[in-house]
Every structure is written in structure tokens, then in C-alpha cells.
Amino acid sequence: MKLVVINGTPRKFGRTRVVAKYIADQFEGELYDLAIEELPLYNGEESQRDLEAVKKLKTLVKAADGVVLCTPEYHNAMSGALKNSLDYLSSSEFIHKPVALLAVAGGGKGGINALNSMHASLAGVYANAIPKQVVLDGLHVQDGELGEDAKPLIHDVVKELKAYMSVYKEVKKQLGVE
């Protein structure tokens, strides 16, 4: 089964990127890295569909059996970079596809608001966010390294995502939409 991990931070050395890379490496996922990809600000113009970064994003998500969205929390919401990437996607990429949500919060404040903003945006594209979600604080990622205490939290959410990926594979089979 194909797993796609979207790093929602525009920072090349951000904590969220450390987490996203860990997930992609540990679980043989494909990383779409918003710190590297040159995804322009979404404007709704038809011409944006032909951009390579947009085609790559849409193709990866559509081909995935499951998606992990990782974001920092900026001003009580997901990053603008992640929201921008979601604006390029639609229900045709997310149909019958489970999505795991993970937020990396800094400064000891929350992360839950980033998750809530992801839920709201995902509802608009009929994405199926799984019940389990993770908030990691700044203590979980320090000096570019993922702390050992964060790894079980990540493994648990990916384990649940993979279970949902199996279920949705069967659902698609029964619906004849594979």
C-alpha cells in the first residue's frame, strides 16, 4: 500500500520537516516536501494545473492509499503552506482515502488548533481523517532530532492509518472504484 507524507512547513530546517522525513523513512512513504517544492500561491487560475509541482502533488495524493499531513501550528492554525497545497487538491484525490493528521507545536502552546483547521479544510474535499491524531511539542524534536518519546506516538498513528488503508482498499473493491 502506498503512503504519502506531506511536510507542511516551508522551513527547510523546521521540526515538522524532521517528523515528516522520519515518517516517510520509517514507513516507506513518499515525501512531498513543501520546504523544497515550488508550489505557487493558489489563485484558482486554470493555468496552474499545468505546473509541474501541482501535477506532482495531485498525482502523488491520488495514487496514495493513505496520506499523512504534518504541520506546524502558526497562529492557531495549520501553516499557510499546507493550506495552500490543500487548495490545489479536491475530492477526486481524497475519495476513499484515510488521512492521518499530525501537528508540531512550539513554545508549549497547543497544536490542537492546527489539527482543527486541517479537519475543516479536509471536510471540504471529503477527505477521511482518521480518529487518532498526534500533537508533538517542541520537546519532542530538538536540535534536528526526533526524541525517543515521540516515536511511539508516531508509530501508533501510522499503525491506525495503515489499518484504515486496508479497510478502504476493501471498500473501494466492493464499490468497484479501484
From Swiss-Prot:
Keywords: NADP, Oxidoreductase
Taxonomic superkingdom: Bacteria
Residue sites binding NADP(+) per the record: G106, G107, G108, K109, G110, G111
Activity under varying temperature: Optimum temperature is 70 degrees Celsius.
Pfam assignment, any one: FMN_red
GO CC terms, sorted: cytosol
Recorded family membership: Belongs to the azoreductase type 2 family.
Function: Catalyzes the reductive cleavage of azo bond in aromatic azo compounds to the corresponding amines. Requires NADPH as an electron donor for its activity. Compounds with paired naphthalene groups coupled with the azo group are good substrates, with the following preference order: Rocceline > Sumifix Black B > Solar Orange.
The protein's name: NADPH azoreductase
Organism: Bacillus sp. (strain OY1-2)
Gene that specifies this protein: azr
